[in-house]
Design a protein with these regions (language model features):
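Membrane-interfacial helix-loop segments of redox and metal-homeostasis proteins
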Residues: 1-358
Length: 358
């Protein structure tokens, strides 16, 4: 496939994903949250009893769909390639910090785009921080940062994460008493939608869509393919929001900083939260969406990162790190600062390749 065709497919996939994300709000998801990998993993962690924040406990079918969409597409295209063994503990810790940064901002990079598409100008500060974090990560990449190579694994090992996802689906359908579900109307965890994740997972697998990769590749290689997907999601969701606002009698686009759904107006911490997320995602090699897609393709490294995201969500809600519409917490601010320092240390320790080669 030529680069021109790849870019065309990326734009098409981004537009479709943006429209799907907007329609999910129409079908019941919270506004500006048709998709949010961080928030949905947080909800799932709560459902599994990893935290006790009652308003955000639900096994999100979108997460299950993303993994299965990637898994089935990878099998169909013979791209299921189990690999792993690259600094698993470091990846777990970085995954936790990605979640801490995301829950400071109240959204992952995917939701950041959707917040912009819904008119939330607070997301502009998040985007600025996200870009700055990526630039810091690119600095270390240029200096030789690497978590070292991964190794080929057995098909059985690569299938563990999809099987675990299947088990979570069984829990969602069976709804046993030990699984926690937000009561209808009590919070975003209850406002669930159909499994659109299958389509998004398949499209993301085929196009290698990554929110971090767009800015990273543009800076490193002057390559625009991934950032076209980023922009296309924004355009697709924005246009769909405007159409829905004009045809349904409900506003899906509200331009401004104040009174935005599931958001706060503290610009500094919106910036720093997404800076941590962007920086840590570069060190991991992909955004939370990309980590889920790679997990479906058989990457145990990405599966470990997803476990880190789940653990980070538990920490955020068990220890008061997560922000709310009222703003960030003191504990959350401290955690973001610790995360930024830890990310710099991890990046520095693992930046040695070019230095040793000199």
């Amino acid at each position: 496939m030529t680069l021109k065709n790849e870019k065309r497919n990326m734009i098409f996939a981004g537009l479709v994903i943006g429209v799907i994300a907007s329609l999910l709000v129409l079908f019941g998801n919270p506004k500006n949250m048709g998709f949010c990998v961080a928030c949905f993993l947080r909800d799932t962690a709560g459902a599994l009893g990893l935290h006790s924040a009652e308003a955000v406990q639900y096994i999100r079918p979108e997460i299950i769909g993303l993994v299965f969409g990637s898994f089935f597409m990878a099998l169909a295209k013979k791209e299921f390639s189990p690999r792993g063994g690259s600094a698993p503990v470091t990846r777990f810790v970085l995954g936790m910090f990605v979640m801490i940064g995301s829950l400071m901002f109240l959204g992952c990079p995917f939701r950041m785009i959707l917040r912009l598409a819904g008119g939330d100008l607070n997301a502009l500060l998040g985007l600025a921080g996200f870009a700055c974090g990526i630039l810091v990560g690119v600095f270390f990449l240029n200096k030789g940062y690497s978590l070292k190579r991964s190794y080929a694994l057995t098909k059985a090992e690569g299938g563990v994460f999809p099987v675990l996802t299947l088990a979570v689906l069984a829990l969602l359908l069976a709804a046993p008493a030990f699984i926690h579900f937000t009561e209808a109307g009590n919070g975003p965890g209850a406002m669930h939608a159909p499994i659109a994740g299958l389509a998004v997972g398949a499209l993301a697998q085929r196009t290698r869509l990554c929110m971090v990769g767009g800015i990273r590749d543009l800076v490193l290689f002057k390559e625009t393919k991934l950032i076209l997907g980023f922009a296309a999601i924004l355009v697709g969701a924005l246009v769909c929001n405007l159409i829905l606002s004009g045809t349904t009698g409900t506003s899906y686009f509200h331009l401004g900083f104040a009174d935005q759904p599931i958001a706060h107006t503290d610009g500094l911490w919106n910036f720093l939260g997404m800076m941590l997320t962007g920086f840590a995602c570069v060190l991991l090699g992909g955004c939370p969406l990309r980590q889920l897609i790679l997990s479906g393709e058989g990457s145990s490294d990405s599966a470990v990162t997803v476990f880190g995201l789940l653990a980070g969500a538990a920490f955020c809600h068990n220890f008061g790190l997560a922000s709310s519409a009222k703003g960030p917490t003191a504990n959350g601010k401290a955690a973001v600062v610790v995360g930024l320092v830890a990310a710099v240390v991890i990046a520095s320790v693992n930046t040695f390749k070019k230095e040793n080669a000199k």
